[in-house]
Amino acid sequence: MFKDITLGQYYQTDSLLHRLDPRVKIVGTLVYIISLFVVDTFAGYFVCLLFLAAMICLSNVPVGYIVRGMRAILILLLITMSFNLFLTPGEVLVRIGFLKITREGLIFSLKMAIRLSLLVIGSSLMTLTTTPNQLTDAIESLLNPLKRFRVPVHEIAMMMSIALRFIPILMEETDKIMKAQIARGADFESKNLIKKMKSLVPLLVPLFISAFRRANDLAMAMEARCYRGGVGRTKMKPLIYEGRDQAAYMLLVAYFAICVLLRFLRLPFLI
Amino acid sequence: MIKISRLIHDYIQRDEEGNPSGTIRALDDISLDVEPGQFIAILGHNGSGKSTLAKHLNALLFPTEGAVWVNGLDTRDQNLIWDIRQTAGMVFQNPDNQIIGQVVEEDVGFGPENMGVPTQEIWNRVEESLKAVGMYEYRKKSPNRLSGGQKQRVSIAGVIAMHPRCIVMDEPTAMLDPSGRADVINAAMTLNREEGITIILITHYMEEAIRADRIFVMDEGKVAMQGTPREIFSRVEEMQALHLDVPQVTLLAHTLRQRGLSIPEGILTREELAEALLGGN
């Protein structure tokens, strides 16, 4: 049931991108996503694609593995494409019954598809090359200025990392409860949606109870190990920028500058 | 190391609206002393108050009456809580609910991080603690991939990394298979013998208790019996009256003795029984 979830999966290998400071990767992903919305021509998307391809090369993650992750959004992609294809007004190219495909619609839906695919691949590249722990560390460090406005940054990061730690444990537990219910005649296979929803209740109640019990135990175990919030805490793996991280930031600035230029130069041969 | 004087702990019962409706006396007038470096076992059936007692040693619960001193520190003093928790580490029953890190080494580093130990020193402590429990080669693994016994040894390493004087283990082997159980107890024994760390082991496996220096048997919130393993396990009927078993060998020897064989009481191991039987001939 939960085998298909590939969200935030980490691909273990050694590469330049894996070793990069996670803060650079988060900032880089944000810059990359913004750049996808800055450029609006096919040439612009080509630049983004080149950048992405270079990053994939640096990541040592097999291209097939990344593309396979795209299957999850295939339906979403097809729906957005068809809506844009058929519903954009403009110069009619083909007419099938009451449906019409316009020139503008065709271009727009193509751009949309490219943009969406690049966006998903780009952001999944970040999670593929960064462990969840590094991600939470980086988020804590990047959000640090917000502490001045009394945002509990450390607590948020700690919550995220504990949540990630408990995902596999709770999944295992769900599986166990499900098997126990099936052994007593529960029906989880029903195709009927309402029946399916109803069968989830006896699954969720014990799951929630056990999750609360675990939370209680964990809180006590953390207190027993002197946890008292972020104040006065040291780090086992502090984040320190190195030469390659600075180089990466420079590269990002250059990349973004190119994207902005492409948008505002409005060269006549670009569509 | 630990001194408990006339300790009483009441749990407050609440009705459905959350109003206090009565109290349950979980610990009733307990006094005991633990010398530094001892290996102590606490036995007792479910609900005898042994977990409640354990939580007092770590300032997770506070006395209703009486007092607990850990290495001379009074647990009633709120300012000393963190020193006490550092002095007396705690290992709980369920390994999954006490491992915080997603990588073994990060979990072991959690305690020292909380104490504000400098980064380089944390790495030293993590290395030495993982080596002490024989889990060093698993340091980069995810805790989810380890067996129960391995997870529990990681939990122990997480406590050792805080350099405690005493480790309280609250049924650390209850959820483990026999080989995991042996690994955990051996790790605890090694720490006790080689590092001189005081160990307080709460268990209901009698085989684990026979290696202790001293045993406390709890019943209904009171210390019902105390003494060396040999003293405790030679009182077979008393133990059975408290719904506790004695080791199988001890029981066998006891039954043989009742049937008229001349062997001593309080036999704890198979070797001792064999020797006694051969000596009798």
Residues covered by each model-derived region:
Chain A
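Transmembrane alpha-helix interface motif
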Residues: 1-42, 48-57, 144, 148-151, ...
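Transmembrane helix-loop junctions in multipass membrane proteins, especially transporters and channels
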Residues: 41, 45, 60-64, 88-96, ...
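Juxtamembrane/interface alpha-helical elements of multi-pass membrane proteins
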Residues: 73-186
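Membrane-helix interfacial "entry" motifs
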Residues: 14, 37, 60-65, 96, ...
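Alpha-helical transmembrane segments and their membrane-interface exit regions
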Residues: 51-61, 76-79
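Loop-to-transmembrane-helix entry motif
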Residues: 69-73, 77, 113, 117, ...
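Alpha-helical transmembrane segments and their helix-start/interface "positive-inside/aromatic belt" motifs
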Residues: 25, 64-74, 248
